[in-house]
C-alpha cells in the first residue's frame, strides 16, 4: 500500500495521542520496530515508527501537535484485514471520548472512527478510498 492514511483528532483542545503508551505497546506487539524522533523543528511529523521485518511491515509518523498520525506504508499477507485491525489498534491511543477521523491523503474519504468501530467498517473504507 502506498497511499497515506491519516488518523486525525478533530477537536484542537481535545487532548492528544498517547505517545508514551503507544511506544511501549508498539515494542511489545511489533518487536523489531525502529523508532526515530527528529529534533528538527522544520519537520511537521517528528516521530517515525518503521518495521520491515517478517509479518506486517509499516511506516507510521506522528505530527508535532500529537493530533495526527499518518500511516504511510502498510503491507502484510492479509493486507486489507490486517490494515483494518492496525488502524483500529492505533485508534485506541487517541482520547476515547474525542472524535477521530480516518481520511486518505486526498481528503476524499473522511470517516469518523469510533473506538467501537468494526473491522468490516474499516475494510469497507479501505476499498472505498482505494487504499
Question: Which sequence ranges carry the predicted segments?
Answer:
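Short Gly/Thr-rich strand-loop-strand
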Residues: 37-50
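Short, extreme N-terminal segment that most often corresponds to the first beta-strand
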Residues: 1-32, 130-131
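Residue-identity detector for threonine
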Residues: 4, 19-21, 33-35, 48, ...
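A common structural junction motif
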Residues: 24-34, 91-98
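A broad, low-specificity signal for short, low-complexity segments enriched in glycine/proline
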Residues: 28-37, 60-64
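Charged interaction segments
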Residues: 49-131
